[in-house]
């Protein structure tokens, strides 16, 4: 999906759900555990346009939530970010949320657009 169609997906969603205040954006780590963050409405467009920053080491935690130090993304190098972009068709409401909230699955990429080695979606 290109950037224009991603933005169109977001705009259509917000037209249907105009009171949405937050969006939970998440990606699976190397163990299949969901890691993510909640973003405010003013940041909704980031994962649908150029991409939003995402902590690279969050995708590389072990099953106990501990950081491994034998990879290029961790505390030893300042815990750098990577790029995250919305997975087309994954934007949905969170009906059980106490305030109007959306959720969206992310794909993790290097800043040059190459797939991030720690994103299980890039392995399959």
Which ranges hold each PLM region?
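ATP/Mg2+-dependent ligation/transfer catalytic cores
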Residues: 1-124
């Amino acid at each position: 999906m290109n950037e224009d169609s991603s933005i169109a997906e977001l705009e259509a969603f917000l037209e249907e759900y105009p009171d949405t205040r937050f969006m939970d954006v998440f990606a699976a780590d190397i163990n299949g555990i969901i890691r993510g963050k909640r973003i405010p409405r003013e940041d909704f467009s980031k994962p649908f346009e150029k991409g939003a920053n995402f902590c690279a080491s969050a995708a590389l935690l072990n099953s106990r939530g501990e950081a491994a130090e034998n990879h290029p993304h961790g505390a030893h190098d300042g815990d750098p970010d990577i790029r995250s972009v919305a997975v087309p068709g994954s934007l949905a409401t969170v009906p059980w949320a106490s305030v109007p909230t959306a959720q969206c699955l992310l794909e993790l990429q290097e800043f040059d657009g190459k797939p991030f080695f720690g994103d299980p979606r890039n392995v399959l």
